[in-house]
Amino acid sequence: MKISRGLTPSTSRPYSVVTIGNFDGHHHGHRALLDRVVATARREAGTALVLTFDPHPVKILAPQVNLMFLTTPEEKLARFEAAGIDEVVFLEFTTAFAALSPAQFAKQVLCDGIGTRELYVGEHFAFGK
């Protein structure tokens, strides 16, 4: 499994099938989402990709919150690899990044940055604010 920090040209990946999140705890819903991403990527001879953020957005948006995690970064990566994920992309979460509109995020990150062809997200996912 490839681990990337930051965006790389989208031409370097075939048919990117992407999910976005922090995946703390890796519960049944996370597994189902990862399974769908992997199955779609395999069907399309593409890349199963997890897009995640470092630091966690809450650490930037609400630094007063004492955020605790269920899984370590190493445990998350091991679970992604066991699920069949091909690549994990870590993006630095900053106040400037948080200020991107949903349209800017879709264009700059999803389309231009990682070449997303299909995107799968969980039930409570929201783009931007």
Where would I find each of the regions flagged by the language model?
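Nucleotidyltransferase catalytic core that binds NTPs
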Residues: 1-129
